[in-house]
């Protein structure tokens, strides 16, 4: 979009070409917090928000943060193929629990998720709205899964980047609307889909406050932060 390109040009001409804060520009994190409030009517502290670069970078960081060699992760599939690779680089193993194709569209059976969890399961990746199936997780299912993962201390990595790609309603249900700040939940989102910024590689993640500093430290090992002028465009 023209407005976004213009903001990036202004930032470049203003000299925003140097390293930025690892967790992202203060102004952008505040704007993301405001955006989340505007669509979900919830308050997220800026300190819980990290802007590591692309949404895929955020997913990779979430996997690095929650998984190690002896662990297992569960992927709700069909899924984008990069997800299993993000898990594999941690040394963890993974398995998939599939959505089922029914006459009413794709569906996920939460009991199938429970049965697929192992003793060493540390993370569940779930993309809703889903690419490629278009399935959208219901609020009831979110409650069920969050309660289950809370009791087992399994981290939900919720990829909500398609939150505005939905028919009939303005925005898809988010785990953020029902979660406690301390819940084992990492929500990933970004600008690519909702704001037509696929090539800008700008996404964010919302984590429990208890791991936000560690997430920022881990981000330093990848790309330090998203380029400052791109953050200004966001």
Could you say what each language-model-derived stretch is?
Residues 1-54, 61:
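N-terminal small-domain helix-loop-helix segment of the aminotransferase-like
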Residues 6, 178-234:
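Conserved core segment of the aminotransferase class I/II
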């Amino acid at each position: 979009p023209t407005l976004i390109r213009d903001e990036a040009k202004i930032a470049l001409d203003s000299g925003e070409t140097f390293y930025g804060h690892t967790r992202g520009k203060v102004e952008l994190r505040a704007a993301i917090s405001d955006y989340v409030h505007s669509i979900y009517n919830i308050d997220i502290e800026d300190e819980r928000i990290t802007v590591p670069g692309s949404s895929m970078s955020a997913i990779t960081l979430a996997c690095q943060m929650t998984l190690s060699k002896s662990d297992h992760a569960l992927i709700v599939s069909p899924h984008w193929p990069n997800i299993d690779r993000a898990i594999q680089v941690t040394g963890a193993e993974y398995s998939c629990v599939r959505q089922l194709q029914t006459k009413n569209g794709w569906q996920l059976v939460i009991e199938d998720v429970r049965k697929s969890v192992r003793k060493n399961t540390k993370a569940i990746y779930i993309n809703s709205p889903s690419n490629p199936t278009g399935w959208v997780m219901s609020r009831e299912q979110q409650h069920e899964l969050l309660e289950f993962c809370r009791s087992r201390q399994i981290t939900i990595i919720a990829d909500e980047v398609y939150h505005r790609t939905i028919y009939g309603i303005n925005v898809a249900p988010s785990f953020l609307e029902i979660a406690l700040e301390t819940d084992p939940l990492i929500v990933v989102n970004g600008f690519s889909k909702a704001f037509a910024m696929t090539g800008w590689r700008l996404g964010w993640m919302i984590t429990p406050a208890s791991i936000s500093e560690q997430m920022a430290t881990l981000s330093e090992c990848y790309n330090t932060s998203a380029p400052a002028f791109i953050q200004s465009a966001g």
